[in-house]
Each structure stands twice: as C-alpha cells, then as structure tokens.
C-alpha cells in the first residue's frame, strides 16, 4: 500500500448529519444539518425557472456578476471578495496557503470540525483552546497562541453550540493574537443573530489587514445543495488564495440563483422571523420536558443530557422513527445533541416522538 501523508492519518473523516436510509420508502425527517426549511418566494422561483444556461460552457471563473452584487449590498470592495465551493473550500485554501509542519492552526475546542481537518490536511499543527459554558474563551485562545500561530479559526455564532462572541470580544481576540496570525471569522449563521452586541465583523475587518470573514449561501439563503461560500479578505490574501483556488469552482447555476436570492429581502426577513419563533417554541418544549437547552442565536439548538448514554439512546430511538438529529461525539460533546429548526411539521413530529420516549 502506498503510504499517505502522515498528517492525513491523523484526520478523522468528517461525518455529515444523517439523511436517512435509501431502504426506507418514507421521506426522512432530517433535523441534522441546519438546512433552511423556508421555500423560495414565487418571484425568485420564476426568475430561477427563466434562467437558461449553456451547460457546455464553463462558468465565470471570477463570479463577476455575483461579486458586483455582494460588493454593493455589503459595501465592500470587489477586490476583497473570493468565492469557495462552500465555506469549507475557503478554510482549506487558507490552511494550505498559510500553514506548514512548523506552524499552528488554532481553534476553539467545540468549533466546527472542518477546522482541524483543514489544518491537518495542510500539515499544520492543530491547537485547540478550552471553552467556558460552551462558548469560546478569548483568554484561553490568546494563551494557546504563540509566534508560530498563523491562523485562528473562530465560528461566530459557533456550530454546534449556538453561542456567540460579542463585538468587543472579537476585538479583544484580534488584539491578543500574534500580529502574523490571520483571524478567520466563520459567520455562516450571522444572518440569524438579532442580539445588539453581535456583529458579523465585516465592518471591523475592513479596518484591518489581518482578518478574514467567511459567509455562506447554505444556511439562511437555503442553497446548501449548490455549495457556495464567499469571504471578505485583505486584498493580498485574496491574491494568495487565488493562486491555488480550483478553476471554475462555482457552477453557473449557483452564481445566478445567489444573485436572485440577494435581491429577495422579504425571503430573508421571513427566514429570520420564522427561526426566532420556532427556536423559542422548541426550546420551551424541551425545557418543559426537563431537558437543558443551551441558549442559541443560530438556526438550531443544542440539548445537554445527564449522560452520553442518554443522549445516544434518544438519537438512536428517533432514528427508528425515521427522525434524524445530530450526535456530537466528534465535537467532544457526547452528552449533547444538536437539532435543526426545521419545518413546523417536522418539529412537531419530533416533539411527539420525544414525548413517547419519556
């Protein structure tokens, strides 16, 4: 057998949220991947249906129309924008460009699993900082950093805990990290947050040359199937990442549909309103049943159980009823489960089954 890179052997394969079995004839109730339950508006659907693309032609490699739209809406210079096949690809590109066997990639203990995978894939040294009350601990992150720390990944809000860092905490983190460390703020769930002391950090990033802010169309925009993420970066970082970014990495349909969705302000507003209502509803229902729910600002909740066994038994029992939620063993949270804010029908079905198992 041909041996792989040693760092690759350290990587635990990423396991996505379960989607059900192809053997089952009934449609699964999938609450495991934080997908949007909100349907596109008729106007957006009509625009999409009128989109006719020549499949024999490669897509625009620079996503120029979409880049222009994002530049206008978010008030950022188009030279600072880069696109990825999902945010994941951007995390890999950053790791490949800025890490090696002598340099560290830093992240919070219960941060998104792709961070350590990307760091290891780039032969970097993985370092994580302990959290406090399921929230990234700024002092611990700063303490764990040193002059070999080149990248710090931080999800804000965090997946899978749903907790967030305030504007002042992000600034404290940036000021406490080494000057040569790139702070990468993953704001995949930022649009769901309504807390006044929160920011997606774009405004702050524009004042500095050492911050990257990533965003995605997979969550509130409901485009998970088309894989599209983007990042605001210092111009030099964009130029560096483009050296190894795969050509034509964003398909033509993803580019066109994203442009249409960015114009649909009502869709975005409806998604936020829906999420706030049903997240509160689900949290209250689980609290009423005696479960501890960690306060979340995202489109999911994390439920903490008395033991890992209790959490696993509930998830396994729900699977038998074709309901899928997220076990968090790989996140070092084996006594917790993550549940997406799905459709009203799916959430009520989930609650009925949980009550039966009480």
Regions inferred by a protein language model and the residue ranges of each:
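Phosphate-binding glycine-rich loop
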Residues: 65-104
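PLP-dependent enzyme catalytic core of the Aspartate aminotransferase-like
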Residues: 168, 175, 309, 317-321, ...
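Conserved PLP-binding catalytic core of the aspartate aminotransferase-like
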Residues: 276, 288-321, 337, 341
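Short acidic capping loops at alpha-helix termini that bridge into adjacent secondary structure
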Residues: 77-81, 101-104, 148, 180, ...
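N-terminal "arm"/small-domain region of PLP-dependent enzymes with the aminotransferase-like
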Residues: 1-57
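Active-site pre-lysine segment of PLP-dependent enzymes
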Residues: 120, 138-147, 160-183, 187-220
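PLP-dependent aminotransferase-like
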Residues: 97-154
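PLP-dependent aminotransferase class I/II
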Residues: 62, 210-287, 291-294
């Amino acid at each position: 057998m041909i041996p792989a890179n040693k760092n690759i052997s350290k990587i635990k394969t990423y396991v996505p949220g379960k989607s059900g079995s192809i053997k089952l004839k009934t449609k699964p109730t999938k609450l495991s991947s934080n997908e949007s339950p909100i349907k596109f508006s008729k106007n957006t659907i009509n625009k999409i249906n009128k989109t006719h693309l020549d499949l024999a032609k490669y897509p625009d490699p620079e996503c120029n129309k979409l880049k222009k739209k994002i530049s206008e809406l978010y008030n950022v210079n188009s030279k600072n924008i880069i696109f990825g096949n999902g945010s994941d690809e951007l995390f890999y590109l950053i790791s490949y460009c800025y890490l090696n066997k002598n340099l560290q990639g830093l992240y919070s203990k219960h941060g998104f699993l792709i961070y350590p995978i990307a760091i290891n894939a780039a032969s970097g040294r993985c370092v994580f900082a302990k959290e406090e009350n399921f929230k990234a601990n700024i002092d611990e992150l700063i303490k764990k950093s040193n002059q070999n720390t080149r990248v710090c990944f931080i999800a804000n809000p965090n997946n899978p805990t749903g907790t967030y860092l305030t504007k002042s905490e992000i600034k404290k983190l940036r000021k406490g990290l080494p000057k040569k460390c790139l702070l990468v703020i993953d704001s995949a769930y930022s649009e769901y947050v309504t807390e006044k002391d929160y920011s997606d950090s774009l405004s702050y990033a524009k004042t500095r040359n050492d911050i990257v802010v990533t965003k995605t169309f997979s969550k509130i925009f409901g485009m998970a199937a088309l894989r599209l993420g983007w990042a605001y970066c210092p111009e030099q970082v964009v130029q560096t990442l483009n050296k190894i970014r795969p050509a034509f990495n964003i398909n033509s349909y993803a580019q066109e549909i994203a442009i249409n969705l960015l114009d649909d302000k009502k869709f975005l507003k409806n998604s936020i309103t829906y999420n706030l209502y049903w997240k509160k509803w689900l949290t209250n229902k689980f609290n009423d049943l005696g479960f501890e729910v960690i306060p979340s600002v995202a489109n999911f909740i994390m439920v903490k159980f008395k033991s890992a066994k209790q959490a696993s038994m509930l998830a396994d029992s729900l699977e038998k009823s074709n309901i899928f939620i997220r076990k968090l063993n790989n996140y070092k949270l084996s006594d917790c489960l993550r549940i997406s804010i799905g459709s009203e029908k799916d959430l009520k079905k989930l609650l009925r089954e949980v009550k039966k198992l009480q």
